[in-house]
From Swiss-Prot:
Protein name, entry field: Cytotoxin 1
Major site of localization recorded for this protein: secreted
Assembly with partners or alone: Monomer in solution; homodimer and oligomer in the presence of negatively charged lipids forming a pore with a size ranging between 20 and 30 Angstroms.
GO MF term set: toxin activity
One GO cellular component term: other organism cell membrane
Top-rank taxon: Eukaryota
Function field: Shows cytolytic activity on many different cells by forming pores in lipid membranes. Exhibits concentration-dependent growth inhibitory effects in the lung cell lines A549 (IC(50)= 0.88) and NL20 (IC(50)= 1.91), in the prostate cell lines PC-3 (IC(50)= 3.13 ug/ml) and RWPE-1 (IC(50)=0.35 ug/ml), and in the breast cell lines MCF-7 (IC(50)= 9.10 ug/ml) and 184B5 (IC(50)=6.21 ug/ml), with high selectivity for the lung cancer cell line A549 (selectivity index=2.17).
UniProt-listed InterPro entries: Cytotoxin_Cobra (IPR003572), Snake_3FTx (IPR003571), Snake_toxin-like_sf (IPR045860), Snake_toxin_con_site (IPR018354), Toxin_cobra-type (IPR054131)
Gene3D superfamilies: CD59
CDD domains recorded: TFP_snake_toxin
Gene Ontology terms: biological process: killing of cells of another organism
Expression tissues: Expressed by the venom gland.
Organism from which the protein derives: Naja sumatrana
Length: 81
């Protein structure tokens, strides 16, 4: 009985997400990083002249404003950038 109870406790701990962590793509989308606490957005930065070629990707706390030369796209789900 104790073994069954211990097994149920372990399974519960493994299955519960004890603290949600966002995952954002790095520059090469095959790789991603787990964002630290407080950084709850993924972002993609690219030059307006070349929108198909991202310059930077990662985690961020506040989405920066785009400019005439640089555009930022932010999102808040895993690997959305």
């Amino acid at each position: 009985m104790k073994t069954l109870l211990l097994t149920l406790v372990v399974v519960t701990i493994v299955c519960l997400d004890l603290g949600y962590t966002l995952k954002c793509n790095k520059l090469v989308p095959l790789f991603y990083k787990t964002c630290p606490a407080g950084k709850n957005l993924c972002y993609k930065m690219y030059m307006v002249a070349t929108p198909k070629v991202p310059v930077k990707r990662g985690c961020i706390d506040v989405c920066p404003k785009s400019s005439l030369l640089v555009k930022y796209v932010c999102c808040n789900t895993d690997r959305c950038n």
